[in-house]
Curated annotation (Swiss-Prot):
The protein's name in its UniProt record: S-adenosylmethionine decarboxylase proenzyme
Catalyzed reactions: S-adenosyl-L-methionine + H(+) = S-adenosyl 3-(methylsulfanyl)propylamine + CO2
Record pathway: Amine and polyamine biosynthesis; S-adenosylmethioninamine biosynthesis; S-adenosylmethioninamine from S-adenosyl-L-methionine: step 1/1
Entry note: cofactor: Binds 1 pyruvoyl group covalently per subunit.
Transmembrane feature ranges: none
Keyword RNA-binding: no
Assembly: Heterotetramer of two alpha and two beta chains arranged as a dimer of alpha/beta heterodimers.
Species the sequence originates in: Clostridium botulinum (strain Hall / ATCC 3502 / NCTC 13319 / Type A)
NCBIfam families to which the protein is assigned, alphabetical: SAM_DCase_Bsu
Post-translational modification: Is synthesized initially as an inactive proenzyme. Formation of the active enzyme involves a self-maturation process in which the active site pyruvoyl group is generated from an internal serine residue via an autocatalytic post-translational modification. Two non-identical subunits are generated from the proenzyme in this reaction, and the pyruvate is formed at the N-terminus of the alpha chain, which is derived from the carboxyl end of the proenzyme.
Highest rank taxon of the organism: Bacteria
Gene3D superfamilies registered for this protein in UniProt: S-adenosylmethionine decarboxylase
Modified sites of kind Pyruvic acid (Ser): 63
Role of this protein: Catalyzes the decarboxylation of S-adenosylmethionine to S-adenosylmethioninamine (dcAdoMet), the propylamine donor required for the synthesis of the polyamines spermine and spermidine from the diamine putrescine.
């Protein structure tokens, strides 16, 4: 069976408040993640909420990577969507563990656009 896209939904719980509020760090971490996945960034958008929180999007040649933070809830939501299954979710979690402080991770893998 063939699919148009592969969507990885990552929820991180028990995140470090100070790290979530460091938007420069989160932006660099997101860009490094894109490079680690061997994707090309073609556009980016970032927004800092007040008093806290952050959303960011990288449009990559293969689709997109987004992040949303809720420091007050110690939570990060990350979505990675690509037109091919070109990455291993275990490697992404290992990368996140190396670069972010969190207590729990939940991952959902979704196959999108079934082609008959």
């Amino acid at each position: 069976m063939k699919y148009s896209g592969y969507h990885l939904v990552i929820d991180l719980f028990g995140c470090n408040f100070d790290q979530l509020e460091n938007t420069e760090y989160i932006i660099e971490m997101l860009k490094k993640l894109a490079r680690a996945l061997d994707t090309k960034i073609v556009a980016k958008a970032f927004h800092k909420f007040h008093p806290q929180g952050f959303s960011g999007a990288l449009i990559i040649s293969e689709s997109h990577i987004t992040i949303h933070t809720w420091p007050e809830d110690a939570y990060i939501g990350i979505d990675i969507f690509t037109c091919s299954k070109c990455f291993d979710p275990r490697k992404i979690v290992a990368y996140l563990k190396e670069n972010l402080i969190f207590k729990k991770v939940e991952i959902k893998e979704i196959l999108r656009g079934k082609i008959d």
